Amino acid sequence: MGKYFGTDGVRGVANSELTPELAFKVGRFGGYVLTKDKQRPKVLIGRDTRISGHMLEGALVAGLLSIGAEVMRLGVISTPGVSYLTKAMDAEAGVMISASHNPVQDNGIKFFGGDGFKLSDEQEAEIERLMDEPEDKLPRPTGADLGLVNDYFEGVQKYLQFLKQTADEDFTGIHVALDCAHGATSSIATHLFADLDADVSTMGTSPNGLNINDGVGSTHPEALSAFVKEKNADIGLAFDGDGDRLIAVDEKGNIVDGDQIMYICAKYLKSEGRLKDDTVVSTVMSNLGFYKALEKEEIKSVQTAVGDRYVVEAMKKDGYNVGGEQSGHLIFLDYNTTGDGLLSAIMLVNTLKASGKTLSELADEMKKFPQLLVNVKVTDKYKVEENAKVKAVISEVEKEMNGDGRILVRPSGTEPLVRVMAEARTKELCDEYVTKIVDVVRTEMGAE
């Protein structure tokens, strides 16, 4: 974690923490670090539907033009759309303006290298070092060497064509309900599934700049649950504001999370001989039931720290092709370089159609342990990792569990929160364990 970069780029309240001035510097210095060996480097910029997107885009573009870049504005597009197009169009870098699932007042900036992958910790550290130098010593081209900016709104269609090619077959006879969170997938998801011959019902597809993630999308799947039952759909697919997450809903209205989707898809891909080394990469937040279900299918697992970037790093390092998070960041590395909600949706519907089963039948093969996650708002989230009393209560609870459950306490990567999570055999035990730890965290960490 750096001064500006969190686990998923630079984030903050737009025009307060993430100001146009900061966005200009991020564009100028970030663009330089990623493109310094190139004359007239090509950089793609996309954004979600937040009202602050235009403001930050203008500042970012100015920063990139000041180092002589050729900027191509993609308009409203998902984060994985930017990632895919950056690589497909041989650009030197891609930039996405979004705060993902966060509320509308927040926004963020994340970079992709020319290979379509997110930046390494070392690259982010170099950008931060240059931003904090007392004097800006970067080149300042003038005249014909200044950067250029063009619109490339056709990029969304190029990404749509790519997605359609990942479907194993058409989706005739499947009724899909979509919730696009009034976000970046609003203009593309309906076309995608209609073009694949699914019957489509939609909600959350009317962005107005202020309603992104507001009671809809992957962080509010209960809205889609009701919609699926109302429309008698076979499956519900909920995306977040920037389209890099997927949470599903079965035909009965039950929520199917990222762990379950990973398990369902991994089992199918293994049966097809397409799961590399019969291994799935997940984070420490994945449910114990997920690992037990994988073991039953003789699928191995690798665990990483929380954050899809760490999942991707592990996948790249050892050549695995399926990974993700319980939160719905799912990575299918044979097709794209980052979490992709629309791609994940296609993989899941592929599996659903090939199986001949309902989604509830597929999801029920994985028995989840009861899990409770409580977020505690604190003044300094990082102190939790060294606090002696917090450590002591965690140790006490783990002894009580006696190996039949687990505890996870960690600072959020993107918000001023400490996350306290417990898994146990019963919901009552989860409540008891989490309450005991949260009480100590609140007392010790200066909870707001």
Swiss-Prot record:
Sequence positions bearing Phosphoserine: S100
Protein modification: Activated by phosphorylation.
GO cellular component: cytosol
GO molecular function: magnesium ion binding; phosphoglucosamine mutase activity; phosphomannomutase activity
Metal-binding in keyword set: yes
Catalytic residues of the enzyme: S100 (phosphoserine intermediate)
GO biological process, one term: peptidoglycan biosynthetic process
Enzyme class at the top of the EC tree: isomerase
EC nos: 5.4.2.10
UniProt keyword list: Isomerase, Magnesium, Metal-binding, Phosphoprotein
InterPro entries tied to this protein: A-D-PHexomutase_a/b/a-I, A-D-PHexomutase_a/b/a-I/II/III, A-D-PHexomutase_a/b/a-II, A-D-PHexomutase_a/b/a-III, A-D-PHexomutase_C, A-D-PHexomutase_C_sf, A-D-PHexomutase_CS, Alpha-D-phosphohexomutase_SF
The keyword Glycoprotein is annotated on this UniProt entry: no
Essential cofactor(s): Mg(2+)
Note on how the cofactor is bound: Binds 1 Mg(2+) ion per subunit.
PROSITE patterns: PGM_PMM
Ligand binding (Mg(2+)): S100, D240, D242, D244
Catalytic activity: alpha-D-glucosamine 1-phosphate = D-glucosamine 6-phosphate
Family designation: Belongs to the phosphohexose mutase family.
Known role: Catalyzes the conversion of glucosamine-6-phosphate to glucosamine-1-phosphate.
Record's protein name: Phosphoglucosamine mutase
